[in-house]
Amino acid sequence: LTSMEHRSYMGSRLGTVFCSAILLLSISATPLNASESGDSAEERMISVIETVPHDPGAFTQGLEIFNGILFESTGLYGHSGLRKVDTTDGSVISQVSIDGTYFGEGITIFNNSVIMLTWRNGTALVFDSEDLSVEGEFSYQGEGWGICFNGDFLVMSNGTSLLTFRDPDSFEF
């Protein structure tokens, strides 16, 4: 699979046509400005305060800053891994590759460990945040896309509108 074919329904022509139709319908049903609908949304400006070089070959799936270090997970079969990146210059501090049968996805940090989802394997890999050694793994049903820790639970996405709240110690929901 190529980098853009990995998303099961997003790569299909039908999916593209469907998404385009929904977009056109939503645009045509949306008022041209907020005053027409009576709603007033606060406009915010975003300014870029710094840019840092990044590996253009990395198919980034997850990012998290922990203890001043940027943790990045990368995807693609045979090229997935986890790396620690210096936030000041974008250099890779250390990195590990994962088994080529896994497609790395989102990551989060819990108890000094990095938890990385895999796309279709139903496996979450657990890494030591210091040396990136594999500490263990959890199993789950379905696809793994994104994950975060909200202070109480691991919140996991499978790419749909469904979020799964999991116990961070057992990975059970």
PLM features per residue range, with description:
Residues L1-S35:
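Secretory targeting signatures
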Residues E72-V96:
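Beta-propeller domains
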Residues G38-P56, G90-S91:
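A short helix->beta-strand "capping" segment at the edge of beta-propeller domains
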Residues F71-Y77, I109, V114-G122, M156-S161:
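Conserved beta-strand positions in repeat-built beta-propeller and related beta-rich domains
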